[in-house]
């Protein structure tokens, strides 16, 4: 199953303006591929960031529990509100 992750945060905790968050993000982002592999998640695209205080990623996992473990270990919830959209490829979703 594919999941679109929409992670939004306030300007106050944005890594561009908050040193504590920046330090955490700079430490964790290089570890993201190994966290994903360890938790059974495949990062399909992203994470992408933008000026709207939103981070977007597309991941794939056979188990929702694996995705939850990935999000906890990657600490996305410590500085974001995470919205998870279970998604299908368009061809499959149109059936």
Report each predicted region and the residues it spans.
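Short S/T/G/P-rich N-terminal loop/turn motif that feeds into the first structured element of a domain
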Residues: 1-53, 62-66, 87-95
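Conserved RNP beta-strands of RNA recognition motif
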Residues: 57-59
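Short amphipathic alpha-helices in soluble, non-transmembrane regions
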Residues: 66-75
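Conserved short beta-strand edge segments in small beta-sheet-based binding/regulatory domains
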Residues: 77-89
